[in-house]
Amino acid sequence: GLQLTSPLLTAWWFLACSTNMALPPTINLSGELTLITSLFSWLDITVFLTGLSAFATTTYTLYMFSSTQQGTLPPNIKPSSPSQTREHFLMLLHLLPSAGLATNPKLTAPQ
């Protein structure tokens, strides 16, 4: 897969997928935990459906990552030039706000 052509971009893609799967310490994890605890006061079926949707999201994200990054390179994709620093800087700028909110959730609270 694409891991053979750009291993560092694969690492960035894995970090983005991990954030989507609500792995600790991401802001998605705190959101899903808050949602699930608030659903305990409702019907039991809502907790089950929320857990099922979280499982489906995680399964789809893992499938998407492994199908694009692992295995052999498809014949229609030609290896490209190595990634530039600006692409890695752009990925860092996308993940820094999420990391900042995960480490300090009070950043979103009004003063």
Swiss-Prot record:
> InterPro entries of this UniProt entry?
NADH_UbQ_OxRdtase (IPR003918), ND/Mrp_TM (IPR001750)
- What chemistry does it catalyse, as a reaction equation? a ubiquinone + NADH + 5 H(+)(in) = a ubiquinol + NAD(+) + 4 H(+)(out)
Listed GO CC annotations? mitochondrial membrane
- Disulfide bond entries: none
Set out the biological process GO terms recorded for this chain's protein. ATP synthesis coupled electron transport; electron transport coupled proton transport
Which family is it part of?
Belongs to the complex I subunit 4 family.
Q: What is this protein called?
A: NADH-ubiquinone oxidoreductase chain 4
Q: Which organism is it from?
A: Caiman crocodilus
Q: What is the lineage of its organism?
A: Eukaryota, Metazoa, Chordata, Craniata, Vertebrata
